[in-house]
Swiss-Prot record:
Designated name of the protein: BTB/POZ domain-containing protein At3g49900
Function per UniProt: May act as a substrate-specific adapter of an E3 ubiquitin-protein ligase complex (CUL3-RBX1-BTB) which mediates the ubiquitination and subsequent proteasomal degradation of target proteins.
Gene3D superfamilies associated with the record: Potassium Channel Kv1.1, Chain A (3.30.710.10)
Family from the record: Belongs to the NPH3 family.
Bias type Polar residues, positions: 38-49
Lineage of source species: Eukaryota, Viridiplantae, Streptophyta, Embryophyta, Tracheophyta
């Protein structure tokens, strides 16, 4: 017994035997001892450091070796041996060829935690508490602590010790779970990315805790930055088959930081929620939640439509399969006699009835939305048809106007000007005359030598046109001249519009006019 006393194990064995009773009495004494009081870090920082110094001194005497490396952690300098620290894969790799190492961020390890880990590497016993188990577990994962041996015997690794403590002590006590969960939130993101503790703590809290415990966790979670909250949301998503709790957490966080978050940040947070894993009441709440991003609301609406369609199909199949046959009725009656009605079946039946009512309400709201959309679609169709008819009528009006303009242009190609005798005419050579383009002839009506039947102007015009376009190259000027004379016989004044090919006709008409005059 003297040898154990000299080695310094008497107090450690006594504390280990009375470990559970000690913590139980501390919990029953006051509720304040469950929180992270400032006294606990003082005890943790002083006691392990003194024990570590003792362990280093004893190891130096036993192996006749002085400390050969320095490790700087959080402003504290540790003078240690390289051989015991080789139990850490991280320290062994980074201390190769050097005698000094600094553990700085992103390694989230404090000096108190490192003193406990280093003492474990020297073979010391570590007293696990709800306040230090999270930091030790993170240090184990970051520093890659494997196992330690004491006197040739292989001891359990520090990872197994912390895991056993979490399962046997922490996850069966609500107060311990809350302490560990607060420590995890303070040590994000390492507490989840390396140790996966947040999801496990929330799962244990939901199993043995009540609504007040969950509300306290929500109050702590909404205070986190967006990046750390994404880690918490992903952890809860992976641990729970249903996402009702995750939706409550995300909804509380979005409401708390509504004016501080962008739409993209809201979408990123809401992407952790699977709408297919939401209960019907929360799915309906998500559809009607104005704080959620529009993309998430659309996803919830589509999922609600799918659930409604699935419920309708299941009801239709059940109705079609329930054929009123005598054999089926006898089987149902036999099953009813054989099976006794239990409280669980009644509760299940009541739950199914409530779900049917909620589904019916959701289906009615969906039908009303579909009807409103159909009305809007019909209104848009009528508006588009009116616009197309209006455009068609405008096009027809434009085409008719263009045709009338073209017809008037064609009718003006051959123009006859009837001038009264009392109007002054522009003389040949005057300004504005068209003597170079037209020739004006004036004649008086001559009394016919013999009575001939008078022809109408229209008939004479037609005959003149026929004679003017008759096929005889030698007689063309003469015929054209007489044709024009015949056309305009009875008119005192007329104007002949001359083309380039009408020089011969103009001369013939002029000579004929002089002879008759």
């Amino acid at each position: 017994m003297k040898r154990w006393t000299n080695l310094g194990f008497v107090d450690t064995i006594y504390e280990d035997e009375d470990y559970v009773d000690h913590h139980s009495s501390s919990l029953s004494s006051s509720s304040s001892s469950l929180s992270l009081s400032p006294k606990q870090p003082i005890n943790l920082s002083s006691s392990p450091s003194m024990e570590l110094e003792s362990r280093v001194h004893k190891w130096s005497l036993a192996n006749n070796s002085k400390p050969d490396v320095f490790v700087n952690v959080g402003g504290t300098r540790f003078h240690l041996h390289k051989d015991p620290l080789s139990k850490s894969g991280y320290l062994k790799r980074h201390l190769t060829g050097v005698n000094e190492l600094t553990l700085s961020p992103p390694l989230n390890i404090t000096a108190e935690t490192f003193s406990l880990v280093a003492g474990f590497c020297y073979g010391a016993h570590i007293e696990l508490t709800p306040s230090n188990v999270v930091s030790l577990r993170i240090a184990v994962e970051v520093l890659l602590i494997t196992e330690a041996d004491d006197g040739g015997r292989v001891r359990d690794s520090l990872r197994n010790l912390t895991e056993s403590y979490l399962r046997r002590v922490v996850f069966v006590n609500v107060d311990y779970i809350q302490i560990v969960l607060r420590s995890c939130l303070l040590l994000l993101p390492e507490s989840e990315t390396t140790a996966f503790l947040i999801g496990r703590c929330v799962e244990a809290l939901m199993e043995i805790g009540d609504g007040d415990c969950v509300n306290e966790f929500l109050e702590e979670a909404v205070k986190l930055p967006a990046g750390d909250f994404n880690v918490v949301a992903d952890a809860v998503q992976q641990r729970f088959p249903r996402h009702d709790l995750l939706y409550r957490i995300v909804d509380a966080y979005v409401k708390e930081h509504d004016g501080e978050m962008t739409e993209e940040e809201k979408v990123q947070i809401c992407n952790s929620i699977d709408c297919d894993k939401l209960s019907p009441p929360l799915l309906l709440h998500a559809v009607q939640n104005p704080k959620m991003p529009l993309r998430f609301i659309v996803r919830a609406m589509l999922q609600e439509q799918l659930n409604t369609r699935h419920s309708i199909m299941v009801a239709a199949v059940a109705a079609s399969c329930a054929a009123p046959t005598g054999v089926r009725h006898r089987e149902i009656a036999t099953e009813a006699r054989d099976s006794s009605v239990t409280l669980g079946s009644l509760l299940q039946r009541d739950t199914a009835a409530r779900q049917n009512c909620r589904l019916r309400a959701a289906m009615n709201s969906t039908s009303s939305r579909i009807e409103s959309l159909e009305k809007e679609l019909d209104t848009m169709k009528r508006f588009l048809s009116k616009e197309s008819e209006k455009q068609k009528s405008d096009r027809n009006i434009v085409e008719s106007r263009s045709r009338s303009v073209m017809d008037s242009a064609r009718s003006a190609s051959f123009h006859c000007v009837h001038q009264p005798s009392n109007v002054n005419k522009t003389q040949r050579g005057d300004r504005g005359s068209v003597s170079n383009l037209s020739t004006t002839y004036r004649r008086r009506r001559a009394s016919p030598p013999q009575a001939q039947p008078q022809k109408s102007i229209g008939k004479r015009l037609i005959m003149g046109i026929k004679n003017a376009f008759s096929t005889s190259s030698k007689q063309v000027p003469k015929k054209n001249a007489y044709a024009v004379e015949e056309i305009y016989d009875g008119l005192e004044d007329f104007v002949w519009i001359k083309d380039d090919n009408d020089d011969n006709i103009s001369e013939e008409l002029h000579s004929h006019y002089i002879k008759n005059k």
